[in-house]
């Protein structure tokens, strides 16, 4: 429904398309905005879970970091554009997005610390790098910045991430 334009539909029309009662829909989400936030939150949780699954059997913290970042950068890819394009117009969306970015940033910092301990990367300010790497996709996904970059926010974030990771990686 989000792909087809939930903002254009009434709650009654959404309930009919989902084949549920209006009462049930209001129990799930008291408004269209809450329904959109609920849906986007679930999408972001699925991306995060997929990222965790992809790295669970990898031993190298640095390889985990590379794979994790590529996976979570999908949240700003073209496939998810429809979900996030008007998200900033919805009250409370910033808090939800900040929560996900905070989780990602914390996990990235953990992997950076583990990478230093494993002597896979240089000694760096892990907090600063985690903040940068955790928010890079979001920065490129803004309307203002999207117009300035040549590729999608996901491709651009991955490209810049590769440069940053190459700069801190120790030669084995």
What are these regions (language model features)?
Residues 38, 51-78, 129-133:
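Hydrophobic alpha-helical connector segments
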Residues 45, 92-118, 127-131, 139-142:
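Amphipathic alpha-helical packing segments from all-alpha helical-bundle domains
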Residues 3-7, 58, 79, 118-119:
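Short coil/turn segments at alpha/beta junctions that flank glycine-rich nucleotide-binding fingerprints
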Residues 67-95, 142:
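Amphipathic alpha-helical segments used for helix-helix packing
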Residues 2-34, 38:
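Helix-turn-helix
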Residues 40-48:
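Short, basic, alpha-helical segments at the C-terminal edge of helix-turn-helix-like DNA-binding modules
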Residues 74, 106-118, 135, 142-172:
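C-terminal peripheral helix-coil segments that are non-catalytic and often amphipathic
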């Amino acid at each position: 429904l989000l792909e087809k334009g939930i903002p254009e539909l009434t709650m009654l029309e959404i309930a009919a398309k989902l084949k549920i009662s209006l009462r049930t829909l209001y129990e799930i989400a008291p408004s269209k905005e809450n329904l959109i936030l609920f849906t986007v939150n679930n999408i972001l949780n699925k991306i995060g879970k997929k990222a965790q699954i992809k790295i669970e059997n990898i031993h190298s913290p640095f390889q985990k970091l590379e794979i994790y970042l590529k996976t979570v950068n999908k949240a700003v890819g073209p496939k998810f554009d429809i979900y996030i394009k008007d998200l900033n117009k919805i009250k409370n969306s910033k808090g939800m997005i900040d929560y996900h970015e905070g989780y990602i940033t914390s996990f990235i910092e953990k992997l950076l610390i583990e990478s230093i301990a494993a002597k896979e990367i240089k000694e760096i300010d892990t907090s600063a790098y985690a903040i940068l790497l955790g928010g890079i996709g979001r920065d490129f996904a803004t309307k203002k910045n999207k117009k300035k970059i040549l590729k999608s926010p996901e491709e651009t974030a991955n490209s810049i991430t590769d440069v940053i990771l190459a700069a801190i990686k120790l030669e084995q």
